[in-house]
Amino acid sequence: MRTLVFARVIALFGFAALLGGCGNANTTSADAPQSPAMRGVIASASDCVSFGQEAVTACAAAIERAVTRHEASSQTYSNIEACEKAVGANKCERAASGKYRQKLSAFMVSLGSSPRAEPLYPAKDGAVGFQSSDKSTYLASDQSVTFSRLALSVAEMQASPKKGGRRPSL
């Protein structure tokens, strides 16, 4: 029995080595497409796993810095009506201080030598996507940006018209 298992393992390694030789040997790193998974829109730290297990810690730390930046720099309003007048209906959240601010909905995460995450907010005009504080827009229909499943669900929910009353915050 042990010999059979050993033989299967050896066969798998041999097959993997054989396949490793397949492909275009002339492809250089400059020719290779960049992985779209190293930059993308995610909705939570749990989405960091979409960048690969080795990137989870860097991704989560970048998100934590983005949340801190959002909390420190977001304009606050004394009531929800003033907030919604400034940023739009159903696009506000209540801060720990009791004041209202624009709802933090997702993050644009870029991993590399200096991992970073940018806070993202609901897109304008019912578009399925998000926008940054500098008004850069990331739409789900844009093929150059990867959305996690959760981020796509959040974008779709925020873009769909509400049906009676306020939609709950995420």
Regions found by a protein language model. Give the residues of each.
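Mitochondrial intermembrane space
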Residues: 2-6, 10-11, 18-170
